From Swiss-Prot:
Residues 1-14, 89-153 are cytoplasmic. Residues 36-67 are lumenal. Component of the phosphatidylinositol N-acetylglucosaminyltransferase complex. Disulfide bonds: none annotated. It is found in: Endoplasmic reticulum membrane. Part of the complex catalyzing the transfer of N-acetylglucosamine from UDP-N-acetylglucosamine to phosphatidylinositol, the first step of GPI biosynthesis. Involved in cell wall biosynthesis. Its EC number is 2.4.1.198. It is an enzyme of class 2 (transferase). It is a multi-pass membrane protein. It holds the Pfam family PIG-P. This is Phosphatidylinositol N-acetylglucosaminyltransferase subunit GPI19. Its main location: endoplasmic reticulum. Pathway: Glycolipid biosynthesis; glycosylphosphatidylinositol-anchor biosynthesis.
């Protein structure tokens, strides 16, 4: 039941937004007034004149066209700020430096501070809550590219 309600509300929203967009485009592109000022004062003779008179009166209810351009420009600038300004702000201000310890751990972590490798093995390596420890590059290289790996190939 909840899924159907979401489908219907999404459909109604998309149709409503499309109608508003079409109305805005027509409002900005239609000439105003549709009828000459002399013909507006007279009684409409044809159906097209009466429709044009109705549309002229309908357009008078809307704000001036200047405001639709201003609103569209403000929306565009807001989009530029969101798409460009916020990621730059996040990258330059909110992101910690790469050499900061907060990039690899948080306040709940158990950071290893050992004097020797043997002390690390006895204190942290085989316990349930191992500490955060940077592996030496020599051990990583030996494990990945050592002689034992080449013999198995």
């Amino acid at each position: 039941m909840k899924q159907d309600k979401r489908k219907y509300s999404g459909f109604v929203q998309s149709v409503g937004i499309t109608c508003v967009l079409i109305l805005i485009i027509l409002w900005t592109l239609l000439p105003y007034p549709l009828l000459d000022p002399e013909k507006r004062l007279a009684e409409p003779q044809t159906t097209t004149e009466s429709i044009s008179l109705f549309l002229d009166e309908l357009v008078e209810l809307f704000p001036q066209r200047y405001w639709i351009i201003c609103i569209q420009c403000m929306i565009l600038m807001d989009m530029l700020f969101v798409y460009i300004g916020l990621p730059i702000f996040n990258q330059s201000v909110l992101t910690v430096r790469l050499d900061d310890l907060r990039t690899i751990t948080d306040s709940k972590a158990s950071v290893v501070m050992c004097e020797s490798h043997a002390e690390f093995l006895t204190s942290y390596a085989h316990t349930e809550t191992s500490g955060v420890y940077d592996l030496p590059i020599t051990e990583v290289s030996r494990l990945l590219y050592g002689k034992a790996r080449h013999k198995s190939d």
